[in-house]
Amino acid sequence: MASRGGGRGRGRGQLTFNMEAVGIGKGDALPPPTLQPSPLFPPLEFHPVPLPAGEEGEYVLALKQELRGAMRQLPYFIRPAVPKRDVERYSDKYQMSGPIDNAIDWNPDWRRLPSELKIRVRKVQKERTTIILPKRPPKSTDDKEETIQKLETLEKKEEEVTSEEDEEKEEEEEKEEGEEEEYDEEEHEEETDYIMSYFDNGEDFGGDSDDNMDEAIY
């Protein structure tokens, strides 16, 4: 019969690490807990390497700081949102919160860079002002009469031009009709001559044979 534990022992739990590696032997008591706070600045085991001294190191440091400042002034640098004040002032609109594109003194050789990265200068939009046109004085009666006379003269000229064109068209049509009639008369004369000269009714046929009519006909 199997035991109650199903073959599982109920011994003491084994440690997951070797105590001798920590420095505690078998049978030794554990050190008492420390109730004091840890030191604020514990001693450093590894000290940082000293900065390179000399002109070369100072030049590299200044160049790095200048590059950082230039990158922060570019329009592509994302700045944190500034919290708005509870009370807005009138002068807040005109204060420059950051550098404008025109104030950036950075002119690289754009031939070596893609065109998408080129800085586009913002143009200040001017406020549109409404232009008030002066009112034209009303036309007097003399001006109206002059315009009417001009229109009448233009109408007369147009009528004269149209009448001349109509007369020219009528003359051309009459000439064409006369030419057609002459052509028809000539054709008619030629047709009658042809009929008179070549028509044969057959009366003269067999005129010489009338003397022999007394003979018997078979």
Curated annotation (Swiss-Prot):
Question: Which intervals of the chain are annotated as region Disordered?
Answer: 130-218
Q: According to its UniProt record, where is this protein mainly located?
A: nucleus
Q: Where is the composition biased (Basic and acidic residues)?
A: 139-160
Tissue pattern of expression reads:
Expressed in the liver.
| GO BP terms, alphabetized | transcription by RNA polymerase III
Q: Which UniProt keywords apply?
A: Nucleus
Q: Name one GO cellular component term.
A: nucleus
Nucleus is among the record's keywords: yes
Question: What domain of life?
Answer: Eukaryota
- Subunit (UniProt): Component of the RNA polymerase III (Pol III) complex consisting of 17 subunits. Pol III exists as two alternative complexes defined by the mutually exclusive incorporation of subunit POLR3G/RPC7alpha or POLR3GL/RPC7beta. Found in a trimeric complex with POLR3C/RPC3 and POLR3F/RPC6. Directly interacts with POLR3C.
The UniProt entry's sequence similarity note says: Belongs to the eukaryotic RPC7 RNA polymerase subunit family.
What is this protein called in UniProt?
Answer: DNA-directed RNA polymerase III subunit RPC7-like
